[in-house]
């Protein structure tokens, strides 16, 4: 869904931690981040600590915050939950927090993605193949 939105001109920004908690999962994350970059989205690596938040903000009107990774595994197998917030003030505050966090992040560019090492590419592809199990 994020790739489709980015390809249609929606401003899609993804923030991931710069330090992995699990290397295998992080490799899969970088692979999927590359797909978003190719679709026209932007990816940032948060440098000021470990970022584990899962939040989505849309149009300054709606926000989704919680523990789920926004995938079927999180919702069906792990029984994680998110809160849908239909409050403009809260959605705008969350967007403002995200924009402040960008200042503590580095942009991960399409050029960086395309110029990664062969070893990194292999790790990402193997991790991506197994990502439904992660």
Please state what every model-predicted region is.
Residues 1-134:
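PLD/PLD-like phosphodiesterase catalytic module centered on the HKD motif
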């Amino acid at each position: 869904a994020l790739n489709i939105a980015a390809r249609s001109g929606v401003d899609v920004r993804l923030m991931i931690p710069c330090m992995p908690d699990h290397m295998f999962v992080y490799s899969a994350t970088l692979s999927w981040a590359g797909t978003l970059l190719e679709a026209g989205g932007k990816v940032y690596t948060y440098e000021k600590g470990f970022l584990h938040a899962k939040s989505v903000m849309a149009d300054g009107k709606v926000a989704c915050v919680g523990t789920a990774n926004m995938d079927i595994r999180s919702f069906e197998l792990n029984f994680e939950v998110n809160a849908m917030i239909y409050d403009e003030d809260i959605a705008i505050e969350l967007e403002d927090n995200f924009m402040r966090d960008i200042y503590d992040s580095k942009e991960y560019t399409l050029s960086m993605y395309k110029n990664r090492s062969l070893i990194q590419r292999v790790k990402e592809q193997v991790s991506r193949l197994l990502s439904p199990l992660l």
